[in-house]
Amino acid sequence: MSSPWKTSQSSVPMPEMIVKIVGSKHFRYFIEKPMNKQNEKLKTEPQTSLQKPRNDYSRRVSRDLPGPTDSSEQQITANPAEKEESKHQRSSLKPESNQKFLTRVFSNRFLDGRISYEANVHCSSVPTGDQSLSYMHSLPRRKSVGWCLEHTAKDSSGQAEEIVQRPSVMTREDSFLTTLVRRELNSRPLSSNLLDKLQKELKTLDPISSGFLHQSQLSCLFLRHKVPLPLLTVKLLCQRFSRRCSPEMVNYGEVLCFLKEATKDNLQQNGTAGYSNSRKTSSPSYHKQSIPPQDSSLLSEVNKSLLEILKMALRPCQGKLSIDCLNMSFRKEDHSFSGCLPLPKVISICSKHGLYVTMTLLETLLHHQELGYRGEIKWKNFVKWLNRASADLSCDMPAGKNKKETQGDLVDIPERPQRKTEHVKTPEENLQTKNPTTMTSAPEDPVTFFKNRPVSQPVEHLAVKKDGQSELWIDRFRKLENALYLCDLSNTGVLERERARRLIHNYNLIYSLSLSPRRINQALQRYRSGENIILEPALQYLKEL
């Protein structure tokens, strides 16, 4: 580094204090531009350091200095009598001490007068990447926020106090500070052990038990104990509980009480939230006991509607769906082991096992708290609810021939023509038609069988049509929805318009949906997108008869 001493004829001494932070160390040194002749006199004759060219500057400096504690650091005044006394005292000092005094005097002009006291400069090492300069602790002048808080406290109390205490009515600044501290302590609340350690060390740092500490001491203590508060929040706390006459001194007892209250509020909120969550996640056997009667009735209604929806989806594949195999497929597809799967994945897995669910059905299930999570389906709970719906569906089926038919379906799955003839007979027996001869002659006379069949309807769907008359209309319409969604292989929710028209007309005849051609054309025209049709609104329009 080049020598800082540069002599010039018109140079005025302007000492500057430079602080450099290198790694974990900080270096402090002074740079001064002395006058050409008076600098030599400064080293040899201490009394000439305060000659006339520098009287105005030193007088201006003395206004900013606090009262000295040492006799060698008396204030510089313009009174001649006091000036001679000060000269007499300074003449007895060594040149080194006088140079130190001058260095302290002129260090008050550090950083162009931004910091007015030498004791204010307090440096710490800065972590890597921290560009906020928040680790350089200094005592700034009172800002508008501090003065606003002080005047608010003064007006509410009606008397001048030594400390800016919290008013009885919480002000806007107090509520903001409370909210800020609670939010920052929400993730990492302060433990009671840490608060006790802080209180002991604060009392150690205050040997005279004045109740006040320097702001930099409090900040360094918080940093050493890793208190999870940013330095900006610590600074706001120090401003809030600072002394009125000296803003750099902070009432640490008030700060600790404030932190204890914020931590207590956070613990209470987290405790109530955890208690409510534990009640929600309790076992199903005790779930009804932990809810009030009104909530239990509402929950039972929701569960009943959910079971009805799942039973409606299970009816077409009753006896063919293996829920254990479905569970294994879900487990294989859950690569992240999160217990959740997206809706298109759930649709594709269910369709592989013969369970046809629509996007609308899954979106309805998302609103249930046990099945939906962030737009995905909790497949484990979904399988549990399918088990319950399947058990209820098997209990709802009447005893007798229907049970035998379901057992025959489970055993004799390859014999599809025989199963279909049985389904032809069952509705006829239940309806008890007047002429049973036609029922027995229908399979025996193939000529009349084909004559009575419409041209647009294939042979294999006659049984389905007769059986469909005993089903609900919404169940038959659900089959139309499943067929259209299965044709959408890419799960885009869009199908080719002409293909959708053919499918809707065909399934309208097969399942006797009684949809008018005019309404079908209106749905296709209203919800078309270019050459395609959007399935969900079109099907909803057809459903609203």
Curated annotation (Swiss-Prot):
Look up the coiled coil feature and give its residue ranges.
none
Give the domain of life. Eukaryota
Give the Polar residues compositional bias ranges. Answer: 69-78, 429-441
What residue spans carry the Basic and acidic residues bias annotation?
Answer: 34-44, 53-63, 415-428
Annotated region Disordered: where? 34-98, 269-296, 415-444
The record's section on Pfam families has: DUF5580, DUF5580_C, DUF5580_M
What is the designated name of this protein?
A: Uncharacterized protein C1orf87 homolog
The organism is Mus musculus (Mouse)
Upper lineage is:
Eukaryota, Metazoa, Chordata, Craniata, Vertebrata
